[in-house]
Amino acid sequence: MSSTAVATAREQAAFAAVELARHPDRPRALHVVAQAFDDWTELRGDRFYGDDRAVIGGPARLGDTTVMVIGQEKGNDPMTRALHNFGMPHPEGYRKAQRLMRQAEKFGMPIVCLVDTPAAYAGVGAEERGQAWAIAASLLCMLAVRTPTVSVILSEGGSGGALALALADRVLALENAVYTVAPPETCAAILYRDAAQRARAAAALRPGVDTAHELGLVDELIPEPYPGAHAHAEFVIAALRGALIRHINELRELPLDALLAQRRERYRGAGG
C-alpha cells in the first residue's frame, strides 16, 4: 500500500479518533487543576538538573482530601505549547514526578496523575540525560509508592511517556481520549517506512480508550457530550472531579498492603 492510496473507512475512522483527541481546545492538565481542585501549590524542579514545564505538579485539595497532583501539560496555543514542549516530557520532568510521588508517600497524600502526551521527548539532549532510565524509574515508582494512585488519560496517552504516569490503582479516561503504544505517525514510520500511512497504523493500533476499557486497562470512561470535551470542558471536568473523589475514597478504605498487592497483580496480569 503506497502513501498515496486511499485509506479505508475503518482506517479513516481510527485516525479521526486520534485527531479528535488532539483537538487544540480540549481541556488540559492546568484546566483540570484550576476547576477540579482547590488550593493548588505548584512545585518545580527535579533537584538534579532543572525544571521541565511539560510536567506540572504539587499538592491540592480534592473535596476533603489533600492530594498530590502530577500532570503532563500540552498548552492550547502556540506560546503555551512551546512553553510546555507540546506535552513531551524530558527526563527532568519524570524525575520531578518521582520527587512528588515520594513526597506524597511521606505525607500520606493520594496521587492523581493527569496524562496527556503523544510521547516522551526523543531529542538528543533528553537521551543524553537518561530519558529511558527516567521513564523506567517512574514506572517503578508508580508501582511501589505506598499511597493510593489514580491516573486520568485526558487526551493523548502515547507510548512509555504516558505509561510512566499511568500505572495507577485506578485508571480513568475521558471518552474521546486515545491510549496507545505509539503515535500513529511513529508506528507508520517504523512498520511501513512511511509516516503518511498514519491512518493505516491507527487502525492497527486501535487507539480509542474504549478498547483499553474492554481490555481492563482503563477502569472508567468519563462521558463527553457531542462533539467532545473541547466544547463542554466545564461539564466534563465536573464529571471527572466527581469520579476522582469517588475512586480515591474507595481506595483509601483499603489496607495499604492489600492495595499494593492488588496493584502488583493488576499489572503483572495485564494483557494476559
Describe these PLM feature segments.
Residues G45, G58, D64, G71, ...:
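Glycine-centered flexibility sites
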Residues P27-Y49, E73-M88, I111, L143-G158, ...:
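Charged, low-complexity, helix/coiled-coil-prone segments
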Residues Q35-D39, D51, G57, G63-L114, ...:
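Glycine-rich beta-alpha loop segments
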Residues M1-V67, G71-K74, F86, H230, ...:
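Intrinsically disordered, low-complexity segments enriched in small/flexible residues
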